Amino acid sequence: MPFHPVTAALMYRGIYTVPNLLSEQRPVDIPEDELEEIREAFKVFDRDGNGFISKQELGTAMRSLGYMPNEVELEVIIQRLDMDGDGQVDFEEFVTLLGPKLSTSGIPEKFHGTDFDTVFWKCDMQKLTVDELKRLLYDTFCEHLSMKDIENIIMTEEESHLGTAEECPVDVETCSNQQIRQTCVRKSLICAFAIAFIISVMLIAANQVLRSGMK
């Protein structure tokens, strides 16, 4: 599973809820389709695919996204996410803490539902080039994504699906089905937003604890 380079611009809408999010550790009721999208975000961190996020995997993922946490910050973040105290984070812990903000209720409206789907009916998707797709996505999501973000998402998804025909491709030059293309790009964007929010929550949690310890 590739890493998605995204910027802090994706995070701002949810940051004011972080203190409440960190203090509430209760079961969440998330639709199955949204749960699968959150599972994709979890896999970005779970590099060895064993179903757990270790401190080392967390550090690797964050550094790949441009963040440079030190060992103390990583330890604080893991402690925040690790509810059963086993030193690692499983998917249930991941969903319980972060699920409410990673479901559609916590993602900008343009990333899901009718608003998003409408974007893909403005033109002939069968004839859309990669550059045209980039421009279309930027015009629609410029409040949340830079052109560089969009290019990184498309490039990363193309690389991740090379030689994997059963997976949903983002290669818009060769993809022959409009619905597949639409679903795949939407999935990539939601995953990118989710990962950005996860990183923001983790860093804010670590900084809050570190500041408290300095007082």
UniProtKB/Swiss-Prot annotation:
Membrane-crossing segments per the record: 189-209
GO MF terms held by the record: calcium ion binding
Domain of life of the organism encoding this protein: Eukaryota
Membrane-protein topology: Single-pass type IV membrane protein
Keywords: Calcium, Cell membrane, Cytoplasm, Golgi apparatus, Membrane, Metal-binding, Repeat, Transmembrane, Transmembrane helix
Localization terms from the record: Golgi apparatus, trans-Golgi network membrane; Cytoplasm, Perinuclear region; Cell membrane
Residues noted as binding Ca(2+) 1 in the record, renumbered to the chain: D46, D48, N50, E57
SUPFAM superfamilies: EF-hand (SSF47473)
Record-annotated EF-hand domain positions: 33-68, 69-104
GO CC annotation: perinuclear region of cytoplasm; plasma membrane; trans-Golgi network membrane
Residues reported in the UniProt entry to bind Ca(2+) 2: D82, D84, D86, Q88, E93
Spans within the Extracellular topological domain: 210-215
Matching InterPro entries: Ca-binding_regulatory, EF-hand-dom_pair, EF_Hand_1_Ca_BS, EF_hand_dom, S100/CaBP7/8-like_CS
Cytoplasmic-side positions: 1-188
Assembly description: Interacts with PI4KB. This binding competes with FREQ/NCS1 binding in a calcium-dependent manner.
Notes on the domains: The C-terminal transmembrane domain (TMD) is necessary and sufficient for membrane targeting.
Function: Negatively regulates Golgi-to-plasma membrane trafficking by interacting with PI4KB and inhibiting its activity.
Name of the molecule in the record: Calcium-binding protein 7
Upper classification of the organism: Eukaryota, Metazoa, Chordata, Craniata, Vertebrata
